[in-house]
């Protein structure tokens, strides 16, 4: 791209690799230069925590605020009841109001780590689209809003087309999602002067619908900006690991496990991830990303420390690094490792090593645990495990034991009391 932005926000987005597409670079850039603008990203409340896959867009909101503009985090209390069909192969399970509220409460904890929700001129706002969606009159909505949408055009969006091409069912409920999301943008523009919606590139169709609707109804000029859907250099979806999703709430994933996820970054991704997930200068990100051989580990440790500090604080980052050094360099146990605590009643006369590997989160199933053992991928206190029938009793847990799956995943098992 040859466009040379005037605004700090667009310049940072381009320089650090956040941009996939924009509906009007020049128009948005000029709006951002003219004064404080308001932008939003929407989040459906489908889980009790956000995960690493959401982190790129959270960093976009953080940079938006750091460059003087107001971010809105829009909770999908209304749209979660419908479910976003974008690029999904099946319909999302429907959640009840209590579960949606609990999920929103869990997600809010994360946003407060990255954004300033004070009364400052560009203080962030947290809103819930249930505020305007729950009370909609269906017939009035069809008359006033539905008439602006072309079904032909909606069917042409890749997010819908790909599902229909596979001859997979798309319910009328899900089909309405893009209309509701478009209406969100209209309401945010009308109520709060919001001029920009951001999201992953899979949201392009939904964003464009919102822009078109707002132009038709309010005759206001607004914009859309998307980020790339990230995969790692080896093709894995960002935010997933062998153990499952990398959650951002510490009650669902310990700061140590979060730190370790970033420490395990593939060499080829270090520079790119430093630009996207930290606030280090671009020149320093490039320097660290260009390190070769064992020297690249410096970049990985800095990446892990910087990202963990943003989410969990500097003390948690230091503790995670210290635990990693204790475990990997000195062969120790480490106080900050994920820990499985068993009561005497739960342990009973003993528990199989396969059960312990599963319960500690190092394997998803007994079958996977047995495979780890048979392929020499499991260790007990740094010694290879060879017997899948091994029983662990209270005597064996007189002091905590360390279980390992491969070289990088570890957990402690201890007896309570």
From Swiss-Prot:
InterPro entries: aa-tRNA-synth_Ic (IPR002305), Rossmann-like_a/b/a_fold (IPR014729), S4_RNA-bd_sf (IPR036986), Tyr-tRNA-ligase (IPR002307), Tyr-tRNA-ligase_bac-type (IPR024088), Tyr-tRNA-ligase_bac_1 (IPR024107). It catalyses: tRNA(Tyr) + L-tyrosine + ATP = L-tyrosyl-tRNA(Tyr) + AMP + diphosphate + H(+). One of its GO terms (biological process) is tyrosyl-tRNA aminoacylation. It comes from the Bacteria. Its EC number is 6.1.1.1. L-tyrosine binds at residues 40, 177, 181. Homodimer. HAMAP family: Tyr_tRNA_synth_type1. PANTHER family: TYROSINE--TRNA LIGASE, MITOCHONDRIAL (PTHR11766:SF0), TYROSYL-TRNA SYNTHETASE (PTHR11766). This is Tyrosine--tRNA ligase. The gene is tyrS.
